[in-house]
Amino acid sequence: MTRFADWLETTPAWLIGLILVAAMFGASLLGEWLKRRTSTAKGDDEEGGREGYIVSATLGLLALLMGFTFSLAVDRFEARRLLVLEEANAIGTTYLRTQMLEPVDRARISKMLVDYTDNRILLAKAPLDQIPALLAKNDQMLTDLWTATLAAWPSIKGLDFSSSYLETMNNMIDLDSARKAARLARVPSAVFFVLFVYVITSAGVLGYAGANKEGRGATAFLFLLLAISLLLTLDIDRPRSGRITESQAPMERLRATLASQPPEVFDRMSAPKATATPAAPP
């Protein structure tokens, strides 16, 4: 099953679609051939009625299985989409609270958060061959962020917001793990394998029931619809290589906000530091 999962992940969707349609046509022709070999002149009407029930039941079960698989894929897609928004909010909150640190720590961590946001956006859109390097850079950035937080801790540990700042930074780091887990949470490959087998078997049942006699054009159209439905489900379940992926708009809006709000922006309402006035000579 691991090989099948790898094949689903690495094979282009259009090629999977061609193979699936060809397999359905082959199964349909095989079913038609078996029908001719086993059919008898007597009792055709009664047998045709039984075949109609079998075809209806087969297609009904196929619709149920495809709907179940599509629901699994959409649920996982929605979870990934919500995590993007949560992470953008967490990074933004951390950035704002960073402005309360000492100037040196504030400048350093603010710059690191901007770079981290850039890398997160690249990581979500990168092709498969670039992901390992970006992941390694991502993990190193998180280590550096926590190291910088520890360096800033002595200057804030006595302040009221120190605990909430640590909590915010921890939450941001935890969301990195949550997004990684969400991208690995896929529809089990065994479900897709059973679905592929069932689709091909259903095509064979249709061929045996004489669907090809009604016109191969209609049969081809049905097979095309089934293949498109299955490929849509498969594409939604491909967070790295699919065309339908979770939007990075929250992260991109955050990046634009960070670019427009460097640390110096937050100093414009601060009271100027009082300068010592030299004492008048006696």
Task: Indicate where each model-derived feature is located.
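Membrane-interface segments at loop-to-transmembrane junctions
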Residues: 44-54
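Short, solvent-exposed mixed-charge patches
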Residues: 280-282
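Alpha-helical transmembrane anchor segments
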Residues: 9-39, 181-272
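A generic, lipid-embedded transmembrane alpha helix
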Residues: 52-70
